[in-house]
Amino acid sequence: MQLFPAIDLRGGKVVRLTQGDYDRMTVYGEAPCAQARQFVEAGARYLHVVDLDGAKDGTLSNYGSIAALAEQGGLYLEVGGGIRTEERIEKYLSLGVDRCILGSVAVTDFDFTARMLKRYGERIAVGVDAKDGFVATHGWKEVSAEKGVDFCRRLADAGCVAIIYTDIACDGAMQGTNLALYRQLAAEVPGVAFTASGGISSEAELLELKKMGTAAAILGKSLYTGALDLKRCVELVQN
């Protein structure tokens, strides 16, 4: 299983939100590159970066930080947050970003998403955020009428090979992740590499996710609070 420690950026700082709420933000550092180096030292080979400003208002205010992370290298780098145009995808890929994550635009413009999946293949992942089982968009403020599992099936049919699935209720809450959900996704949407995201806070959960065939897991607040030790997690489950 791949482990993606997460760096969420707001105003160039390393932060975490609780359940996607911008008013419940904790700053964990001022230097994203230094944080990434710490992850490398712990054995990480992958990095999940979210531009929270981009996700909220489409700006590129964290572009410099992301460019510096890409230039620093040493990690497979996936980036999400505010990627809604092919121009933005190209901008990131040309920096050296390995994979771009499409979020809300996958719901609001499925045709565009299908075209990007066809054009860029495995260099595109889709982030699916679900609230009570239904797809949520725009920083989790809007909830659609489509079930997350059904949306994942549509994405798979459009050629999507990687989906980062977040159960919003779990995210940043440090109460554990929704293991039953990832078991269901693996069974009902075969052929897609799912990344578990949100609430993972124990080694037992990581081992269970690996056992059920989950492709990857994102670790956020659990690392920053010290609930999980990245070096130990890498030794336990990383390919």
PLM region descriptions:
Residues 8, 39, 47, 92, ...:
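Conserved, mostly hydrophobic/aromatic
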Residues 60-67, 141-150, 175-184:
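Charged helix-capping and loop-helix junction motifs
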Residues 83, 94-112, 167-170, 198-202, ...:
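Glycine-rich phosphate-binding active-site loops on the catalytic face of alpha/beta enzymes
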Residues 53, 61-118:
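Glycine/small-residue-rich loop that forms an oxyanion/phosphate-binding "nest" at active or ligand-binding sites
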Residues 48-51, 78, 101-102, 125, ...:
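Conserved beta-strand positions in the central sheet of alpha/beta enzyme cores
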Residues 11-12, 19-23, 90-93, 97-171:
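Conserved anion-binding
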Residues 46-64, 104, 165-175:
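Glycine-rich, proline-tolerant flexible connector loops at the mouths of alpha/beta enzymes
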Residues 72-73, 77-98, 180-216:
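Catalytic cores of alpha/beta
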